[in-house]
Amino acid sequence: MLETGQSGKLLYRQVAELVHSRGVEKIIGVGEEIRTAAARFEIEKYFFRTTEELLESDLLAGLRNEVILVKGSRAFHFDRISDRLELKVHETILEINLNALVDNLNYYRSKLKPETKMVCMVKASAYGAGSYEIAKTLQDHRVDYLAVAVADEGSDLRKAGITCSIMIMNPELTAFKTMFDYKLEPEVYSFHLLNELIKAAEKEGVTNFPIHIKLDTGMHRLGFAPEEIPELIDRLKKQTAVIPRSVFSHLVGSDGAQFDSFTRRQIEMFEAASECLQEAFQHKILRHICNTAGIERYPGAQFDMVRLGIGLYGIDPFTNQIINNVSTLKTTILQIHEVPKEETVGYSRKGHLERDSRIAAIPIGYADGLNRRLGNGHAYCLVNGQKAPYVGNICMDVCMIDVTDIDCKEGDKAIIFGDDLPVTVLSEILETIPYEILTSVSNRVKRVITRINEKKNERKRHEKDEHTLLLRIFRKLLKIDSYETYILPFVMSLFLGVVICPENE
């Protein structure tokens, strides 16, 4: 765990209290110091002096139907534990690196004025990464708001223990009671929605419920038109059920230089309309229009708050390059066949072989989110760092890859996307956006949460930006913003069945 400056006795007392309060059923500890605190853990528990001792035991082989969080410094080589577990089950997993996510958060924070607040998007299961684990990490790093699409996403986070303010971007008319009960703040984009919300709040006896007013400045998807602001103000003034907490709009093309003039017009329109709304009320109404690309390209449009989306998950929407990779989709080779020249592979005999080949089957298919258009040699995965093209049609649960020129064996890993094969490569092949690929990874693919400390994919141009780098160092030295350490970073889920942790890092 992160260095806290506390004594081991006090620290592990706090660890034990949190483990017990979160319903963790089993703990596996590695290291001498945590072994001395064994009596504090009144649950099923196992302790080992070293990682090697744990690996040599039969404990990991006996784990069944359990959600496992592996947390530890690189000195403990806990990646060997993850490798052992993956090999045991031969499963396809989406590995989420929380340290990379925090690095991305800090990168964009370094672009902001100190007083600028931040909304972090965790809708669509945090872009496929897993809502709770991401939300908990962001809450620990003191973001101002989380944003989800629908009320059920927000209530699930509340039930899991998330206390941070939550914004609902697509509120349903049938979910107002849920929003009131769980303090979920809805976006309001039309008079119909506003009137129904006021009616529901008055029925429940709710007053001054915070809402977020959306303005349409050019997206033409949802939002009040600027000319509707006077009528909106009049409606809001005549009731006490709801109160505007923020007003915002959505930039259409902030990631494209060809749209710069349109983006500037949007910003000007928003500034004028939001000022009109603010002047009608005595309390402060937060204003926000910048998304990820806007943070980077329009620093003068930060207003009071910004919304961080795809950049949080490691993708720069302006350059389509990786900042720090967060998500790695990987699987293992199930079987390798020696297939003669002129034979075919897969359904409809689409995979025609022009040479004697070694064909490997891996347990991932279109039901897991692997797009069928990647088959028949249109894309590849990585096996032991080398390109292995997809052969034939991608099946529902399995696909085949050509490993003829690769030194590999059954049980070896295959990387679908990750550090060395960015998801942006696949999105370009498919002529789509990385969002679609990330959110298409199905729920049956297990999410494994890690905290890998190596910053392998730190953006080079970021390191060359002297001002940004100095600002990050300054903040780190003063331990402000999200650079503060926190005591118990490794208990990441209310639903954990097993926690594996070391002594102090």
PLM feature segments, named:
Residues 27, 70, 157, 247, ...:
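Residue-level signal for inorganic ion chemistry
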Residues 498-504:
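Short, intrinsically disordered C-terminal tails of secreted or membrane-associated proteins
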